[in-house]
Amino acid sequence: MKLRTNAGPLQGTIQVPGDKSISHRAVILGAVAKGETRVKGLLKGEDVLSTIQAFRNLGVRIEEKDDQLVIEGQGFQGLTAPCQTLNMGNSGTSMRLIAGLLAGQPFSVKMIGDESLSKRPMDRIVYPLKQMGVEISGETDRQFPPLQLQGNRNLQPITYTLPISSAQVKSAILLAALQAKGTTQVVEKEITRNHTEEMIQQFGGRLIVDGKRITLVGPQQLTAQEITVPGDISSAAFWLVAGLIIPGSELLLKNVGVNPTRTGILEVVEKMGAQIVYEDMNKKEQVTSIRVVYSHLKGTIISGGLIPRLIDELPIIALLATQAQGTTCIKDAQELRVKETDRIQVVTDILNSMGANIKATADGMIIKGPTVLYGANTSTYGDHRIGMMTAITALLVKQGQVHLDKEEAIMTSYPTFFKDLERLCHD
């Protein structure tokens, strides 16, 4: 598709879709809680729909009523062996978390994904789940999908130190631990997003968080809840950056989730000189509205414990850095290489093809700015965040056109992205 270029100031108010991470976990925990769970504000992107369909195939009744998702949970014992392969589409979250959940079930399943997901390593969940007594395997020593899993009603608790910073691996182990008899401990390398821990407790589960160590004594039963999903800060990030780098822009981003394990991007842009104001902050619900205006920015260093708190925002932060004065250095972000694409290489290649000055490193990027950006022919490469980054980049292009292939990938997390973009350009 041909993208909008040479945009004037962006003006208006935006309500971003529901948080993808929280939406997944609401469905997963609701499916094994006892009673009727109702979810408001659920993201209806393709990844979450993959999770919903997986649980329907596992015998859980899930339907939409009055703009809410209603899940009829029967507890951990209520799941039934699927009659077909579970297709997780493009969703690594679905595959890894559901594998953890099915670890304690007395049946076997085969889990597959699309071409992109089939290139993402699952060894990170295979090894701890095997330690708990699950028969699980993928392709090659990296355990690429498809995964074959035989659950075990007599799971063993483990103490596991994560070799990488991964909320998905942590979550897979905790979901299995809810069904294991005894004390499971997960020790993180760096603190990652804690939605699973928070939602287990919201559903009546018990665990202890002590710094980087999470302790859970199983088995436990969960109780159905009413869940309201806040706006996804990872989706809001695209408008946040657009507002900061397009001259004359002023945007109000409504109802954005600001769980502290996800707010790294806000800290980074403020350090770079961004003018942002928080309105209607609700600290208990961890939700706020964010007013952003065009700002003059300077380069910075992004590394260490900050990385897990903004890992999904790094592509759009890279674009931001191309418009900042000086050098921005992103380090310790090697996890980007095993996302939907090798995001370090793809971001570098796309932005450099449009005139940026970026050097890819083994674990990040070195970005020099500010640079003028030009038109190019490019692709999402099947990665939703790459697609949205490119669409925001195109707004800065004053010379040439920008053509984007495989734009349908954006449906993964933000089905109304282009509609919202057009509205902000016209308000």
Curated annotation (Swiss-Prot):
Annotated InterPro entries: Enolpyruvate_Tfrase_dom, Enolpyruvate_Tfrase_sf, EPSP_synthase, EPSP_synthase_CS, RNA3'P_cycl/enolpyr_Trfase_a/b
Known catalytic reactions: 3-phosphoshikimate + phosphoenolpyruvate = 5-O-(1-carboxyvinyl)-3-phosphoshikimate + phosphate
Lineage: Bacteria, Bacillati, Bacillota, Bacilli, Lactobacillales
Job description of the protein: Catalyzes the transfer of the enolpyruvyl moiety of phosphoenolpyruvate (PEP) to the 5-hydroxyl of shikimate-3-phosphate (S3P) to produce enolpyruvyl shikimate-3-phosphate and inorganic phosphate.
Record-level Gene Ontology MF annotations: 3-phosphoshikimate 1-carboxyvinyltransferase activity
Superkingdom: Bacteria
UniProt subcellular location: Cytoplasm
Pfam families, per the entry: EPSP_synthase (PF00275)
UniProt keyword list: Amino-acid biosynthesis, Aromatic amino acid biosynthesis, Cytoplasm, Transferase
Main localization of the protein described in the UniProt heading: cytoplasm
Pathway(s): Metabolic intermediate biosynthesis; chorismate biosynthesis; chorismate from D-erythrose 4-phosphate and phosphoenolpyruvate: step 6/7
Name of the protein this chain belongs to: 3-phosphoshikimate 1-carboxyvinyltransferase
UniProt keyword Transferase present: yes
Active site: D312
Gene Ontology biological process terms in this record: amino acid biosynthetic process; aromatic amino acid family biosynthetic process; chorismate biosynthetic process
Binding annotation for 3-phosphoshikimate: K20, S21, R25, S166, Q168, D312, K339
Gene Ontology CC: cytoplasm
Subunit text: Monomer.
Residues involved in phosphoenolpyruvate binding: K20, G92, R120, Q168, R343, R385
